[in-house]
Every structure is written in C-alpha cells, then in structure tokens.
Design a protein with these regions (language model features):
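Glycine-rich catalytic cores of cysteine/serine-nucleophile enzymes that process amide/ester linkages
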Residues: 10-69, 94-102
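Generic secondary-structure boundary/loop-capping signal
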Residues: 19-20, 84-87, 135, 140
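A structural motif
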Residues: 69-93
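Extended, non-globular alpha-helical segments
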Residues: 1-13
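Solvent-exposed, acidic/flexible segments
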Residues: 28-31, 72, 107, 111
Length: 157
C-alpha cells in the first residue's frame, strides 16, 4: 500500500498476540495497537519505546487519513519530544485492563502517544465529555471511535 506524501495517517492494528487479544477483549474493540504514519515512516511506541521506523503495510492494519491541517516539520518536532521515552507497561495493565487512572510522564503506550500528537496539531484543544483530554484513558479502539466521532478521520484507505 502506497500512502500519499505529506499526508498524516493513523494506522490501527488488529490483535496479533496474547496482550493484543486481551486489550481488544477488555476494551470491546477490534484494535490492539495504533501508530502514526507520515512519508513512509511510522511514529510509534511499543515495548521498545517511542521511535521511528520505515512503514511496511501488513494485512492486519486499518489506515485512516488524519483530516487536520498540519505542518510536517511541526509534527516531527512534536514527536521528537517523545522519541526515546519508554513504554508504559503499568498504564497498559492498570488503565486499559483494570481502569485505574495511572500515568507516567516519561513513558507512553501507543494510543496515548497518538492522541497526544493529534491534540498537539489542534493546539491542545481536544475535549472528551466537555473536559480536557486524558490521553492515558484511550485504548486503540476507544481512540478510533473518538476520532471517527470527532470527524478527524474518514474512511479506511
């Protein structure tokens, strides 16, 4: 799959392993992971931390264009603030599987980082239930539903 240059996408993954299936089971959704895609690179966090790698399409991915005006350099600059930060295992367990509100400002999980980056593109103006966004409360499936509801993403690519 070839994506358009200088367009920002969010890529949602269907589960591939035990943790992914547990996340989708607990969150009543179909997605276990998500990441941002820009100019053939993936901007993501997983157990190796926040980093960038070349994008390779796999059949378990659903990709949506982010329908927001944005500047490529600004997006990359925002991501670099998080690059190298660790993966938040505890938040995955506690906030996604058990629903205890826990957050580590130096560690992030996938949907948390994606929502933070999207919110930065909107000058931190996103709200949920009339309150400021708490990105650590969004699973990949909840993020997908929220972005669809807010019309930030459209149809699958």
């Amino acid at each position: 799959m070839k994506l358009e240059k200088d367009k920002l996408y969010i890529c949602f993954h269907k589960p591939q392993g035990l943790l992914g299936y547990l996340i989708t089971l607990r969150t009543f959704g179909k997605y276990a992971h998500c990441e941002m895609v820009l100019n053939d690179y993936v901007y993501y966090t997983n157990p190796g931390g926040a980093r960038i790698k070349p994008f390779i399409y796999k059949n378990y991915m659903d990709i949506y264009e982010i329908k927001l005006p944005f500047d490529v350099d600004y997006f990359i600059k925002q991501f670099k603030k998080y690059q190298g930060k660790g993966y938040d295992y505890w938040a995955i367990l506690l906030s996604q599987l058990i629903e205890i509100d826990i957050e580590d400002k130096d560690r992030y999980f996938c949907s948390e980082l994606c929502l933070i980056l999207i919110n930065k593109l909107m000058d931190d103006s996103l709200t949920y239930n009339l309150k400021s966004i708490k990105a650590n409360q969004f699973s990949p499936s909840k993020l997908y539903k929220y972005l669809k509801f807010m019309e930030i993403i459209g149809e699958k690519e």
